[in-house]
Amino acid sequence: DEVLDGDDMVVLNYQIQSQSPLSEGASYEIATHLTMTSAAAGDWYLLFETNGNRAQAETDVTNNTLAVPITVTAPDLMVEIVTAPATAQTGQPITVSWRVANAGTAGTSAGPWQDGVYLSTDMALDGADTWVGSFTNHTALAPGGSYSRVQPVTVPIDLAAGSYYVLVRTDNTHVVLEGDGEDNNVTATGIVEITLSETADLVVEEITGPEFVTGVKVKN
């Protein structure tokens, strides 16, 4: 809103030194760049407050704030669909495909950002899940644009057998500034039943050698 209060985000503090003291009727101008790192896309106000620390004595401080309406745009990367085989074996590769779209109101830069692929026993990505691959995108994505990937990944040989989901998270290392658009970066497949692969079973079948062994002892 247009009212400055404790709920507002501070995006810049600018120390004025060269313009002090300011003569009666005089003015100064400041030009700078702001990066909106955490604001959600939509309509906002930029609030400008002069003498915010009240270091300058004034006859009236009620006119120290100005509100300027702005529209914030941001990309919003989302994983639209993920597919994988219904069955897999430990130690063996599977093919995973997914599509990433920009559902936001602004385009991305040319990147790069990574899409991460995980195996999970549930549909929520957390520290208990198993990472199986990361794949880099170097192409800018305009609003409404999308790209598709088809990649082989290998199921870890030491993974326990059971029911798993394949999870794909786009912008896996959070390099794309999406504002509030981070909560749709992960999508899961249906259940993938993973079984243990047959492993080698080495057996000593026979030992051969001479019946008698002669030893030599050397002493200095």
Locations of regions flagged by a protein language model:
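Extracellular/luminal regions of secreted and cell-surface proteins that mediate adhesion/ECM remodeling
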Residues: D1-N220
